[in-house]
């Protein structure tokens, strides 16, 4: 199964999460590509069986809108029936950005493979383990 782990990271926290997601998917037998949002677009969606997306909360609990947001908006038309998962880090708030993002994906018809993973600031061992499990869940 081909998996693209697509993420944007400003501080390295979401990047660390993305690496753990990729590790979990590889260990479960996936053919994994780790890509930044600058290197992925809607035209790539059909190449992959599953796409976990990672983005931190920005501003008032929103997706990063300079690079990740436009890429994700472009991909939305390809989400119907696609197996995906969501992850990201935050520094304040309660994770509203992730719940809103999940609702958007469900409205687009995406199949959420598992519960989303969010970490406050840098992921700890428990957070990284949750990311590995998220990666593995994409193959089940």
Where do the language-model regions lie?
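FMN-binding flavodoxin-like domain, especially the glycine-rich phosphate-binding loop
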Residues: 2-3, 13-16, 20-37, 42-140
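Aromatic-flanked redox-active Cys/Sec active sites in thiol-based oxidoreductases
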Residues: 7-11
């Amino acid at each position: 199964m081909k998996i693209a782990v697509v993420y944007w990271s400003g501080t390295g926290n979401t990047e660390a999460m993305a690496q753990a997601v990729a590790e979990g998917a590889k260990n479960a037998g996936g053919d994994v590509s780790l890509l930044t949002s600058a290197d992925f677009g809607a035209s790539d969606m059909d190449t992959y069986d599953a796409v976990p997306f990672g983005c931190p909360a920005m501003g008032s609990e929103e997706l990063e809108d300079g690079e990740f947001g436009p890429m994700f908006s472009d991909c939305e038309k390809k989400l119907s029936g696609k197996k995906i998962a969501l992850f990201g880090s935050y520094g304040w708030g309660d994770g509203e950005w992730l719940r809103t993002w999940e609702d958007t994906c469900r409205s687009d018809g995406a199949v959420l493979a598992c519960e989303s993973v969010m970490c406050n600031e840098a992921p700890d061992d428990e957070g990284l383990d949750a990311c590995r499990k998220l990666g593995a869940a994409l193959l089940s």
